[in-house]
UniProtKB/Swiss-Prot annotation:
The keyword Secreted applies. It is found in: Secreted. The keyword Cytoplasm does not apply. Belongs to the hainantoxin family. 20 subfamily. Residues 24-47 form a propeptide. Putative ion channel inhibitor. This is Hainantoxin-XX. Disulfide bonds join C49-C62, C56-C66, C61-C77. The presence of a 'disulfide through disulfide knot' structurally defines this protein as a knottin.
Amino acid sequence: MKSATLLALSFLLIALYFLICEAEHSRYEEHEILEENMGDVVNLEQRSCAKPGEMCMRIKCCDGQCGCNRGTGRCFCK
């Protein structure tokens, strides 16, 4: 009986963690941001030359710095 209760609580904890993570960082928003940035012709040259290891939502930034607006979820190269 104790093992069944422990198993059920573990499952609920994992499900809760998954739901919280999905609410904060939904995959749809990530893809929308990525597509929006990739389609941004104005900043395309700036994003194509990056310092090693510096990326903004999988898009490289020239000066190695990236800013992400938490309110809108949009990311931009500084």
